[in-house]
Amino acid sequence: MARTVLVRRLLLVLALFPAAAFAQELFGAFAYSAKEKKHGWAINYPTKEAAEKAALEHCQKNAETCQNILWFRNACGALVTGPEGFGAEWAEDQTHAVNKALKACATRSSSCAVTATYCTAKPK
């Protein structure tokens, strides 16, 4: 009887607090200066805003014209650059993020190459 009551209480708690409330969201971001060809990144921040701020600050250590170009949540981001442009994309895994960024860069530039790729830690 006590076990049944405990199970019912546990089910009630789980119903009141959806699984999303227990999931940890981790954010990453890239900032880039197309003029100066410098980038900054941030990974595993608790909010999008914090990740973007950190990426911009990281980029601004080496360049003056940095802008936030990509953010991602519980995923991977890739920055691909070429002489005339860049591509920045995200996906659930590194391979797909890189492939998407390569394709985006190829529409703007020749000789695109992977500049950076990072993935957030797996959510707990």
Predicted regions and their residues:
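Helix-coil modules at protein/domain termini and other flexible surface or pore-lining loops
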Residues: 2-9, 21-124
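Sec-dependent, cleavable N-terminal signal peptides
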Residues: 15-21
